[in-house]
From Swiss-Prot:
Residues 1-170 are annotated as: Essential to the intracellular anchoring function. A lipid is attached at residues 36, 129 (S-palmitoyl cysteine). Residues 392-405 are annotated as: PKA-RII subunit binding domain. Its main location: membrane. This is A-kinase anchor protein 5. Signal peptide: none annotated. Residues 171-182, 242-252 have a biased composition (Polar residues). Changing residue 392 to P: Prevents or diminishes RII binding. Palmitoylated. Palmitoylation at Cys-36 and Cys-129 play a key role in the targeting of AKAP5 to lipid rafts. Palmitoylation by ZDHHC2 is required for AKAP5 function in LTP-stimulated recycling endosome exocytosis. It is found in: Postsynaptic recycling endosome membrane; Cell projection, Dendrite; Postsynaptic cell membrane.
Length: 427
């Protein structure tokens, strides 16, 4: 029994040494595992008093048990050795539980004392389960703040541009009305030209409004388009004040030629403001001296296009009408004599050629009758109503006779075919 007790003591000492010799590796392993699942400040605070109380209890128990183990008791036998094994196993389990608790407390203290950069690095490497859900939330919050700021700025810019563009557009509307009134007075002399100028005035105002709205959608390019529109509107106003009131078609032509600049500006926001302003001013200066030439060419083109289209349409309609009338007249000319010929010749063709089953005597008599009827008639125009009546009666009688004979022959043939079938079946 003593030998067994001594062996048991030796094994327990080795276990203690092994447990005391490798605390660092266990702590390092348990740090990573515990940090992944228990990284919370509340949990750390709650664990601190528990760990302190458990450490005090273990410290109280350890000296008592150590004193008991130092005293040799060889006389108690096997039950005493079993009890010692159980108590020492409990000690080893309690020591193992104490070490992870200390490992939990130390990283919590280190995490509180460390910098924010170290926290981020540790969280990225060791705690992905906690880091990844927090990251997108913060980014979304920041993105929402940035989007809201940008949208507020864009709205403010849009409101400023709306306020700036409404005033010149209202001025343009009043001037357009005045020019339209003048053009109505001139329309008594040149109706077509003035009507076209009025249409161009209305289209210019609509296109400018559309270009402003499109610029507001593009954000930063809205500022450039708004400034260009305002500058060009000012140049147009100055030119309108300098020119006489009778030059309304000139104004419309200039505005029409300045519109392509507006349409080309929004898709190029990368060009700086100064270059765009210089290009716009150059284009306006170049279009100003050539206004008369543009006017003449536009008026001629606008007058010739509708006239050409109308003439082409009228010529097409006339040609179609002529062809239709010709076709109708030709068809009527062809159909009129054909109808008369059909009514006159069907009977003779039927009697002579198509009536194969008619006996020869009847055909000869029919031919003789027709010859006798038409012998005295040199033409269709010389016939009278009585002759037409006789022709109708004769044709009707001949048709009836032929029909009766054909029906009788068909019946006879059918009877003969039936008899032949019966005979064939009997045979």
């Amino acid at each position: 029994m003593e030998t067994t007790i001594s062996e048991i003591h030796v094994e327990n000492k080795d276990e203690k040494r092994s447990a005391e010799g490798s605390p660092g590796a266990e702590r390092q392993k348990e740090k990573a595992s515990m940090l992944c699942f228990k990284r919370r400040k509340k949990a750390a605070k709650a664990l601190k008093p528990k760990a302190g109380s458990e450490a005090a209890d273990v410290a109280r128990k350890c000296p008592q048990e150590a004193g008991a183990s130092d005293q040799p008791e060889p006389t108690r036998g096997a039950w005493a050795s079993l009890k010692r094994l159980v108590t020492r196993r409990k000690r080893s389990e309690s020591s193992k539980q104490q070490k992870p608790l200390e490992g939990e407390m130390q990283p919590a203290i280190n995490a509180e004392d460390a910098d924010l950069s170290k926290k981020k690095a540790k969280s990225r490497l060791k705690i992905p389960c906690i880091k990844f859900p927090r990251g997108p939330k913060r980014s979304n919050h920041s993105k929402i703040i940035e989007d809201s700021d940008c949208s507020i700025k864009v709205q403010e810019e849009a409101e400023i541009l709306d306020i700036q563009t409404q005033t010149p557009l209202n001025d343009q509307a009043t001037k357009a009305k005045s020019t339209q009134d003048l053009s109505e007075g001139i329309s008594r002399k040149d109706g077509d030209e003035v009507c076209e100028s009025n249409v161009s005035n209305s289209t210019t105002s609509g296109e400018k409004v559309i270009s402003v709205e499109l610029g507001l959608d593009n954000g930063h390019s809205a500022i450039q388009t708004g400034t260009l529109i305002l500058e060009e509107i000012e140049t147009i106003k100055e030119k309108q004040d300098v020119q006489p009131q009778q030059a309304s078609p000139l104004e419309t032509s200039e505005t029409d030629h300045q519109q392509p600049v507006l349409s080309d500006v929004p898709p190029l926001p990368a060009i700086p403001d100064q270059q765009i302003v210089e290009e716009a001013s150059n284009s306006t200066l170049e279009s100003a001296p050539n206004g008369k030439d543009y006017e003449s060419t536009e008026i001629v083109a606008e007058e010739t296009k509708p006239k050409d289209t109308e003439l082409s349409q009228e010529s097409d309609f006339k040609e179609n009408g002529i062809t239709e009338e010709k076709s109708k007249s030709e068809e009527s000319k062809r159909m009129e004599p054909i109808a008369i010929i059909i009514t006159d010749t069907e009977i003779s063709e039927f009697d002579v050629t198509k009536s194969k089953n008619v006996p020869k005597q009847f055909l000869i008599s029919a031919e003789n009758e027709q010859v006798g009827v038409f012998a005295n008639d040199n033409g269709f125009e010389d016939r009278t109503s009585e002759q037409y009546e006789t022709l109708l009666i004769e044709t009707a009688s001949s048709l009836v006779k032929n029909a009766i004979q054909l029906s009788i022959e068909q019946l006879v043939n059918e009877m003969a075919s039936d008899d032949n079938k019966i005979n064939n079946l009997l045979q």
